[in-house]
A protein has these predicted regions:
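N-terminal, polar/charged subdomain of small-to-medium soluble alpha/beta proteins
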Residues: 1-94, 102, 106-112, 116-150
Length: 150
């Protein structure tokens, strides 16, 4: 049975706990995960903190649509998407995407697809705190190019 967990909130998550839930199903031979973290630098500047904002309700709906599209393309078991919001510090986790499937090819492709679409289609906004002041982070052309290959 296919199961999906989508969580958006300020709470930190534990990668091991998320992996354990994904890996419970014996019918899935592949578990692929990605964890994104706050870097201490961006665009040549030091980053002291990162604040993520979102559009409540719309963000979760967008993430559910991305997962549904992935399920339409690949045979998937469990899928987890966790995205933090609020203020975070370098080294803290921002995002977790976990995908299971019977085979690794589907799991790798679906995980990459979900992450590429999340970066370009989900309504999140990033603001970095640097020694020079706060600034909004613009979307990157490389993220758009990655999503366009799907």
């Amino acid at each position: 049975m296919a199961e999906t967990r989508i969580l958006v909130g300020p709470e930190r998550f534990t990668v091991g706990t998320e992996y354990d839930w994904l890996a419970e199903r014996d019918e899935d031979g592949a578990v692929v995960t990605f964890t994104g973290k706050v870097r201490n630098h961006n665009l040549g500047d030091s980053v002291k903190a990162l604040t993520l904002e979102h559009y409540p309700g719309m963000t979760e709906k967008s993430l559910a649509a991305i997962v549904a599209e992935a399920r339409g393309r690949w045979p998937l078991g469990r899928v987890t998407v966790i995205h933090r919001i609020g203020e975070m510090w370098p080294g803290e986790e921002i995002v977790f995407v976990g995908v299971t499937s019977a085979h690794r090819g589907s799991a790798f492709a679906a995980g990459e697809f979900i992450m590429d679409y999340l970066k370009t289609k989900a309504p999140f906004w990033k603001r970095e705190a640097t020694p020079e002041g706060d600034r909004w982070v613009e979307s990157r052309d490389s993220d758009k190019q990655a999503a366009s290959r799907w």
